[in-house]
Amino acid sequence: MDEAMDMRFDMVAQGKALGELLPDMCRQVYDIAEKWKNMEAYDFVGTGFDYAAAWFGHAKVFEALGKYAMHINSEEWLHMNFFMRNVDKIGTIIVANTTNPA
């Protein structure tokens, strides 16, 4: 039961931390959305368990914007997308969780 209680306390602590972080996150998201609203395409880069978040991001661009987007792992991005032309029209989002060993 001690482990279960530790998990419960951890969930409460995570909720409080998120509540403190969200206002600044919202501001950052709105700022980047304003700057990137005219981008022609978006790359979502993720490796390891962050690859799923990259996939989700590219799917949301399809659904919400109807613009070109792709998900790719960092190794492939460095070999392929790194050499794209007109990079000022491609928004690149790198998903890099600090706990990801990849």
Predicted regions and their residues:
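A SIS-like phosphosugar-recognition module
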Residues: 1-102
